[in-house]
């Protein structure tokens, strides 16, 4: 996948911060986010950029993730504190702000909420959340259904993914 010239600096950064799988995944999320933004009337460039950087802290050690979160004066909720899998999104949003000096709160929010979602998500937050679910590298059992729904209705796709995640959490105990 070719990265547009204006994002080459960030592409190079990702190559130093992510393993090969996560790097390819990030390119796929960026591509899917751009497509969904075009489909649903959001800014395709912001969607691509947020998708590209959504996992920037994914391969960082938990201590490094926590350090970035603390540096940004972010207070973790009790459930966030207990679940390390959530830290990369929070740390990623902090990294965008503190290290990359990104000031667009829509992009920062899309990175912050791409793992859990939240009530009253912005269009860009929904797009990056879904793009993470449907990127080309994803192979989970319902991925084709989510891809199909994401082409028809962003709200239906969001509802389906939330239900899917809840049922998976319940099944996994």
What do these predicted ranges mean?
Residues 168-173:
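Charged phosphate-binding loop/patch that engages nucleotide di/tri-phosphates or the phosphate backbone
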Residues 1-4:
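Non-catalytic interface/linker regions that flank or bridge core catalytic/transmembrane domains
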Residues 9-16, 36-162:
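Divalent metal-dependent catalytic cores for phosphoryl transfer on phosphate-bearing substrates
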Residues 25:
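N-terminal glycine-rich anion-binding loops that anchor highly charged ligand groups
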